[in-house]
A protein has these predicted regions:
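Conserved beta-strand in the GNAT
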Residues: 37, 43-52, 56-64
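Short, small/polar residue-rich loop motifs at catalytic or cofactor-binding pockets
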Residues: 30-32
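Conserved glycine-rich acetyl-CoA-binding loop
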Residues: 66-72
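Extended interaction regions within the primary functional domain
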Residues: 9-12, 35, 57, 66
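Short amphipathic alpha-helix that is part of the acyltransferase structural core
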Residues: 1-27, 37
Length: 72
């Protein structure tokens, strides 16, 4: 199940750090971006943060998947 996360996004920091190793960089886009988390059996397996850059342009800032679920 994919869930749109609108608050307390930082609780997924460990997952986001898999794709962006600097917490300071994550802090720059996390709150202004739209966040989606993929759950399986109530466990977050993947996360994606997308920002609106204006002029009908969106950018994927972070897309992270737990290592054991990558390449599937």
């Amino acid at each position: 199940m994919v869930v749109h996360i609108t608050e307390n996004k930082k609780r997924f920091l460990n997952l986001l750090l898999l794709a962006d190793e600097q917490e300071s960089m994550i802090d720059r886009y996390l709150e202004r971006g739209e966040m989606f988390v993929l759950y399986k059996n109530e466990i977050p397996l993947a996360a994606c943060v997308i920002t609106d850059e204006g002029d009908n342009v969106c950018e994927i800032k972070n897309i992270a998947v737990l290592p054991q679920y990558q390449r599937q």
